[in-house]
A protein has these predicted regions:
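Catalytic histidine-centered segment of alpha/beta-hydrolase-like enzymes
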Residues: 376-389
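Conserved alpha/beta-hydrolase "acid-adjacent" motif
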Residues: 352-358, 383
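Hydrolase active-site cap/lid region
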Residues: 274-320, 373
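Proline/glycine-enriched tight loop/beta-turn segments at coil->beta junctions
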Residues: 152-158, 164-173
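Short beta-strand/loop motif that positions the catalytic acidic residue
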Residues: 338-339, 344-347, 351
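N-terminal targeting or regulatory segments adjacent to alpha/beta-hydrolase or S9 domains
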Residues: 1-145, 152
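Gly/Ala-rich beta-loop-alpha elbow adjacent to hydrolase catalytic centers
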Residues: 264-272
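Cap/lid segment of the alpha/beta-hydrolase catalytic domain
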Residues: 174-239
């Protein structure tokens, strides 16, 4: 098996060029204060934060459109009562803090079908790439949601892309994309996955529910279904994300893979942190610019925050009940399973979609594990070469002999 050279990633290896402005690991007190940054770092943080605000407003506008029907629902007394019942259901699950009850394991191996990916994917990877799919056997955790969740046609077919070496199985790096960012090609290039592949890893790119080919027919954008069905719909989407990924782990384990690392960005970072609290087959986990309290994050997302506030006001929603219910799918509600030295969190100081304070909350919950920051925003990962080298140094002892 080819060894990994932790510091060998040059800037020219990156398919998407970004400035190599170094970040650093957090100190014992957490992320750096503004005064601790160099002038160049402060300029990059400030400019990237402004760019993120524009992007955040655009995404929040899309989310607002998906949530408008919920305002009409709030006007109907029966739907408002049903939502309160659902909130209590997830709040009670969250209060138990038992990940095995909250996220039951798959009961059968997936029946996976595979076909070669397109030539562009194989050219990017410089290796064997296949697109795999299997039918999800997920059953909604909330009995009241089972008919609705079972009725999704495309969402209940799981999709992933697998990069494999001829002499496999190899240690596998799994990646979970962010909200609306499901394209395999984009993620492969953005995270420099061809370089990880050449370092000896097999790679698995997992598609979240309601994204990409899992988006239901007539969905206006990838990821629409995540927020289109109210809080209960979001909770079940997260439950299905965990369940279907565990089915993917079953498949990898069946094919002989015994070392799996997991990383994810944004919503994918949130999901990867949650999975690391549920399944002990994850050897190492790296949430990248994660959200950990989506309800608090959306509070800052204009105009979506106004739509949520209006809906809650009309329905007479109990704010404390909402906060308790949203903890159901938060990684802050469960203990991580990988050992402390196998957890690495990455945050962007200029991030205004998943503010660095979110990552810092996870860092505190995860016993102040390794925490790396870079001076960019949510999508412009300035110093990405630096944190990719950091990821490789972090992973090598666990993934390779």
């Amino acid at each position: 098996m080819r060894g990994v050279e932790p510091d060998s990633l040059p800037v020219e290896e990156l398919p998407i060029p970004v400035p190599d402005v170094p970040g650093a690991d957090a100190t014992a007190r957490g992320l750096p204060r503004r005064v601790d940054l160099t002038l160049r770092q402060r300029m990059i943080v400030d400019s990237s934060a402004i760019a993120d605000l524009a992007l955040r407003t655009s995404i929040a506008s899309l989310l607002s459109a998906t949530m408008v029907p919920s305002i009409a629902g709030a006007l109907r007394r029966s739907e408002a009562v049903a939502e309160q019942k659902q909130l209590r259901f997830y709040a009670e699950l969250a209060a138990a803090k038992d990940p095995q009850v909250s996220f039951p394991s798959p009961q059968e191996l997936p029946r996976v079908s595979s076909r070669p990916a397109n030539p562009v994917a194989e050219w990017v990877a410089k290796g064997n790439v296949s697109n795999i799919r299997f039918r999800s056997n997920f059953q909604a955790v909330n009995p009241d949601m089972r008919d609705q969740c079972a009725g999704f046609v495309r969402n209940n077919v799981v999709h992933a892309q697998h990069w494999r070496h001829d002499d496999g199985p190899r240690p596998t790096l799994c990646l979970i994309h962010g909200f609306m960012g499901s394209a395999y090609l984009f993620n492969g290039l953005f995270f420099s996955l061809p370089w990880f592949y050449r370092c000896g890893y097999d790679v698995m790119l997992y598609t979240l529910p309601f994204h990409g080919r899992r988006a239901e027919k007539y969905s206006p954008f990838s990821g629409h279904g995540y927020f289109a069905h109210g809080m209960a719909g979001f909770a079940e989407a997260m439950a299905q994300a965990v369940h279907d990924f565990r089915s993917l782990l079953d498949y990898l384990e069946y094919t002989g893979v015994d070392r799996i690392a997991l990383t994810g960005m944004s919503l994918g970072g949130y999901t990867s942190a949650l999975i690391a609290s549920v399944d002990d087959r994850i050897q190492a986990v790296i949430p990248n610019v994660p959200v950990v309290t989506p309800d608090r994050t959306v509070d800052e997302w204009f105009p979506a925050n106004k739509v949520v506030a209006l809906r809650d006001w009309i329905a007479g929603t109990d704010t404390e009940l909402v906060e308790a219910a949203t903890m159901y799918s938060s990684p802050l509600n469960y203990r991580p399973l990988p050992a402390k030295d196998r957890r690495l969190i990455i945050a962007g100081l200029g991030d205004r979609l998943a503010p660095p304070e979110q990552a810092e909350m996870l860092w505190e919950h995860w016993d102040r594990c390794t925490f790396h920051w870079f001076p960019g925003n949510h999508v412009l990962h300035v110093s990405q070469p630096d944190y990719l080298r950091r990821m490789t140094r972090f992973l090598a002892p666990f993934m390779f002999d």
